[in-house]
A protein has these predicted regions:
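Short glycine/serine/threonine-biased micro-segments
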Residues: 10, 55, 72, 82, ...
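Short, electropositive, low-hydrophobicity segments enriched in small/polar residues
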Residues: 13-16, 36, 78, 88, ...
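Short aromatic/basic micro-patch
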Residues: 54, 76, 120
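Catalytic-core segments of hydrolase enzymes
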Residues: 1-64, 103-108
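Short, small-residue alpha-helix embedded
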Residues: 77-94
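C-terminal subdomain of the subtilisin-like protease fold in secreted/lumenal serine endopeptidases
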Residues: 3-4, 20, 27-30, 42, ...
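Short pre-catalytic strand/loop immediately N-terminal to key active-site residues, enriched for Gly-Thr
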Residues: 40-41, 65-77, 112
């Protein structure tokens, strides 16, 4: 956007085709969740628009209190994959401009669920988009 920021938000975990905010705002990349089978997670909100794409959101290992680790589920685990990919796209030498990040993210893996926007995040293809 005009402030040089890529805004990414989780789509929500109501298992419904509803718009939640801030993901429903213009210019925000709204992220749904997929399973390890590349299918729509049962809990994820869905529908395009506003869902722009999906990323893994089930069984994501994360840090946990007292120096341990645990697996987490939810679109709040999906959105950081997209944020990290956007950072890689912007950080590449000669990388993408902020305005072209969404186009690169749209180079997602074409899983066959139109409710998940452009499909599942493909970090490699998104970063390669910046070098075309």
């Amino acid at each position: 956007n005009s402030n040089g920021v890529v805004s990414v938000a989780s789509a929500g975990n109501d298992g419904q085709q509803i718009m939640v905010y801030p993901g429903g705002l213009p210019g925000v990349v709204d992220v749904a969740s997929t399973s390890n089978q590349d299918t729509q997670s049962v809990f994820t909100n869905y529908g395009a628009p506003p869902v722009y794409l999906a990323a893994p959101g089930e069984g994501v290992v994360t840090t946990y209190p007292w120096g341990t680790y645990a697996a987490g589920w939810g679109t709040s685990f999906s959105a950081p994959f997209v944020s990290g990919t956007a950072a890689l796209m912007l950080g590449q030498n000669g990388g993408c401009s902020v305005s072209s990040v969404a186009s690169g993210l749209a180079k997602a893996d074409g899983i066959s669920d139109p409710q998940l926007g452009h499909g599942r995040l493909d970090t490699y293809s998104a970063v390669q988009f910046c070098h075309q």
